[in-house]
Amino acid sequence: MTSLPSNDAPYRLIDGVDFGVDVIVGPFTNLYGCSVGDETRIGPFVEIQRDVLIGARCKIQSHSFICSGVELGDEVFVGHGTLFINDKFPAATTDGGELKTDADWELVPTVVERRASLGSGVIVLGGVRIGEGALVGAGAVVTRDVAPGEIVAGVPARVHARP
């Protein structure tokens, strides 16, 4: 694990993060238990949870949330306010009425392949794979896999162009 990036942004919570070289992290970020590749840029007000893998030369814009179980390939762009969801059946309590703990969640992994771009305000549901070079339009809700090179947009996201 390398040390905290050298930029001196205020009010960051960073715990147990494996940073590559030349990573820049903006102010007001929460990063814990994740891995961030070389030359990646993380904007302000971003949260990245544990067990997230982020490739090299990615750009993650402000106000984005990347939850546990997400993997971003190299050179991925994540637009402002993008959200990843990692539980297929979210609920506050168990069937017995007890408040859920981390052990109660059914985490489903999500993969965004190399050079894919997600516009601002995209929501990516758990278990989805977004293919290499795919483009997801702003505000889309991705509920199923996106093939490499496809352009999708809308709610739910639908194919608008194929390579």
Please report, for each region that a protein language model flagged, where it lies by residue.
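C-terminal/domain-terminus segments
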Residues: 127-145, 151
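Short, basic/aromatic beta-hairpin or loop at an interaction surface
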Residues: 19
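Flexible, glycine/small-residue-enriched loop-and-beta-strand segment within the central core
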Residues: 2-15, 25-127, 155-156, 160-163
